[in-house]
Amino acid sequence: MVLNWRGVKSRLYSGKRRIDGRNKGLIAIRARGGALKRKYRYIEHYKQKWMDKWLFVMRIEYDPNRSAHIALCSILKEGIYFYVISVAKLEVGSLIITSNLKQGILQVGYTTKIKNIPEGILINNIELMENSGSKLSRAAGTSSLIIKQYNKKYSLVKLSSKECRLISNECYATIGTVSNIEKKIKKSKKASESRKKGIRPIVRGLAMNPVDHPHGGRTKGGMHWKSFSGKLAYNISSRKKTKMSSRYIIIGHRKQRLMDKKKKNG
């Protein structure tokens, strides 16, 4: 994909103050800091504002704040500009639309309600609740699969994490896969690439002192792996058991991955 960048629209970005993994001065996430300065681009996740209006893709740009590319769109004959997350195979000069038509034309980049999308279609930028803005499948190269219409209210969707979840038929989603699919294949060739992104070297817990890490000052074994804050790590679920949205999860991502492994092994 060729990126056509000619400067950022002044009303669509602002300065961004970096936190560098700190919370009130205390380290919340290790090995963060020292990244290049960035300008935050405002992304339009609520496309229902422009219902039944054709959007013209002016250019596709690189965004340092996210893994996916973004597309600068304008409403024809109105002079309104905004950014949206670009979809794979979306080209400069193409037209996209947000519509509720049940028998509308389904093309890459079109946004509509889940109930209007047939089974077996890949979607992205999915809403979790009605009119809440896109929340799921927004990273580079990700997409979700519509398995079937569960009932009149919900559809069964398989997310990129292999989790099978019920999502309301009234929620909006975009057809296609998020752009920059090559992100998973690309590897950093030198340390400076990671430092420019704000990723610093990570020191092993075993190499630290006991005051710095639970693994420090001792040999391996004798306890379960822990994080630097003392919480259990590796294969431990950190999700709240009493979370309200858990009732919409039909098959969790851990269970689904085990089922896929058994199918491969036969």
UniProtKB/Swiss-Prot annotation:
Listed GO CC annotations: mitochondrial large ribosomal subunit
GO molecular function: RNA binding; structural constituent of ribosome; transferase activity
Keyword Mitochondrion part of the UniProt annotation: yes
Main location (coarse class): mitochondrion
Keywords, in A-Z order: Mitochondrion, Ribonucleoprotein, Ribosomal protein
InterPro entries from the UniProt entry: NA-bd_OB-fold, Rib_uL2_dom2, Ribosomal_uL2, Ribosomal_uL2_bac/org-type, Ribosomal_uL2_C, Ribosomal_uL2_dom3, Ribosomal_uL2_RNA-bd_dom, Translation_prot_SH3-like_sf
Keyword presence, Magnesium: no
Record localization: Mitochondrion
GO biological process, one term: mitochondrial translation
One Pfam family from the record: Ribosomal_L2_C
Family: Belongs to the universal ribosomal protein uL2 family.
Protein name (database record): Large ribosomal subunit protein uL2m
Gene encoding the protein: mrpl2
